[in-house]
């Protein structure tokens, strides 16, 4: 698999795609699942309620956001890989957090949800043909390819893991 080219995704997503130097994106997504599981083992239920500042997400909300992102990006990838050309609306992440119940869900359930969602996404990506990987569609009023969405998913996790390490777990 080659890296997505500029024009296959909105410029905004370059901040995620640039975090993924590898080209075997399915392996990256698979390795992240093990990395996430390892990190989650170090966080207690008590610690999962921590937010590093006022109006900042708790660890639980961060994990919930990652699950929401996995679902949104994979939904886009599924539709586009099936040659669905219907434009896909964007979503407002803060609104999703505000209307969630993440802080009242057990940390173990939140982490299991993310890991199972990632596993399902891996199965989807492994099933795609070369042609499907290159299909493009429209999401959030911008063009996006299936392969770009996979790289965005991996970069999105890397972006938030960096924040988790630096702002939540380093204190």
PLM regions: where:
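Alpha-helical initiation/capping and key positions within long helical/coiled-coil segments
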Residues: 24, 28-31, 61, 65, ...
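Solvent-exposed interaction patches of small proteins and small membrane subunits
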Residues: 20-27, 83-86, 104-105, 109-112, ...
